[in-house]
Amino acid sequence: MAITRWFFSTNHKDIGTLYLVFGAWAGMVGTALSLLIRAELSQPGALLGDDQIYNVIVTAHAFVMIFFMVMPIMIGGFGNWLIPLMIGAPDMAFPRMNNMSFWLLPPSFLLLLSSSGVEAGAGTGWTVYPPLAGNLAHAGASVDLTIFSLHLAGISSILGAINFITTIINMKPPAISQYQTPLFVWAVLVTAVLLLLSLPVLAAGITMLLTDRNLNTTFFDPAGGGDPILYQHLFWFFSHPEVYILILPGFGMISHIVAYYSGKKEPFGYMGMVWAMMAIGLLGFIVWAHHMFTVGMDVDTRAYFTSATMIIAIPTGVKVFSWLATLHGGSIKWETPLLWALGFIFLFTVGGLTGIVLANSSLDIVLHDTYYVVAHFHYVLSMGAVFAIMGAFVHWFPLFTGYTLHSTWTKIHFGIMFIGVNLTFFPQHFLGLAGMPRRYSDYPDAYTLWNTVSSIGSLVSLVAVIMFLFILWEAFAAKREVASIELTSTNVEWLHGCPPPYHTFEEPAFVQVQAN
């Protein structure tokens, strides 16, 4: 019975749970890889061996965290669990395809881990640029296995995106317009559209790289009339939307958390929030070359990409100030999810400010491939996406399980994690401004102090991760059941109790919309 339930599931709640468990496991693998990186960099001199093994670890860390931790948890886990409940749908539009979307991920993960285990591993960085990723600099099957891994993860995401778009547009009650759905639903809708439009470009780029490596084509080889810069354009046309794919569901979750713990019926500026997400989604597609300021673009091209990148700060600012306006005048409940949300707003804004710095092509020429860039994207991912995930998990855990997490320990966990990530990544701004380059396993001893501080911070974060596992165990051991839920009229996912029954909305929901 258990085998058929979990392997052949067509239930959105079960598949969401599978995604959450898989993402948590992958997150621990990715954390272990990051600790190896920080151990290597904690002092000058070699620890793990040569630069190849170091860069294999860096590459695997990036792929694991992006494709097997953040995306499965945010989109697969919370998306599957919450979206049918939030729109009153009995399940996803294509339940069996939903199951396939999940079960493509473990084989994909296996291929990625295999790529590290054969030959010398894929030490290309997650960008997999040729000619380093070509069949001379990376002979053997490692890069090919990485490419196949990305193909499977990409198919999984495309199928999931089709499923979410269809579900959200088609499975609402007839009386509900798209502009009456919760913000998390909007966030996942925009995310799904971004995935659907950007992933095929990545698939094309890495397939061309595969044929360059194995079938003697020369798409990226100047000797045969190709151009390695073409690969960069294809890769970043996917990977810039990808970073918005990683953060947009987080925006949606933060909107729900901030409104709920401010005691508000709805977030401030609902329509502004929706249009801001759509604007971010659109602008995310027309700024990709800001990752390529150092390849020798025309000055007018650089001027355009600088300006377009800065424009994204406007809808992002709309969202940040709307969250602050939602908090304003609220009856604030100081519970752990709100702490994660407040941490998110502050740290995501800091990461956004360093992003504005890097948007300037002239400054980016100097800062490109330094630790300043690493600090920037870890502020928006390690403290944006991850804080959103943690806040959402603590907020919706009672819905998923029927049990409550320990309120004091989750607050302590937040405090340790907050100190850990800031201690890890704030010093990296200094290293970058001092010119320390990325993706090197060793450094001159002038950089020792801040690298040591950063590595100590990573150990603090490790303590937080271990404490989180303890908090989970404690909740399931203590079995504190949920007493009551407030504000269910505007938080419809809670209407069926905690946890909700296996099948919800088996009959269509009756929705009466008041005329304004």
Curated annotation (Swiss-Prot):
Q: Give the primary localization class.
A: mitochondrion
Annotated Gene Ontology MF terms? cytochrome-c oxidase activity; heme binding; metal ion binding
Q: Where can this protein be found?
A: Mitochondrion inner membrane
Question: Belongs to which family?
Answer: Belongs to the heme-copper respiratory oxidase family.
Asked whether the UniProt record includes Nucleotide-binding among its keywords, one would answer: no
Which positions bind Cu cation? H240, H290, H291
Under PROSITE patterns, the record lists: COX1, COX1_CUB
The note describing how and how many cofactors are bound reads: Binds 2 heme A groups non-covalently per subunit.
Record's CDD domains? Cyt_c_Oxidase_I
- Lineage of producing organism: Eukaryota, Metazoa, Chordata, Craniata, Vertebrata
Give the encoding gene's name.
mt-co1
On whether Ribosomal protein is a keyword of this UniProt record, the answer is no
Give the membrane topology, semicolon-separated if more than one: Multi-pass membrane protein
- Name of the protein this chain belongs to: Cytochrome c oxidase subunit 1
Q: What pathway is this protein said to act in by its record?
A: Energy metabolism; oxidative phosphorylation
Q: Which residues lie on this side of the membrane: Mitochondrial intermembrane?
A: 41-50, 118-140, 213-227, 287-298, 358-370, 434-446
Ranges annotated as spanning the membrane:
12-40, 51-86, 95-117, 141-170, 183-212, 228-261, 270-286, 299-327, 336-357, 371-400, 407-433, 447-478
What are its GO cellular component terms? Answer: mitochondrial inner membrane; respiratory chain complex IV
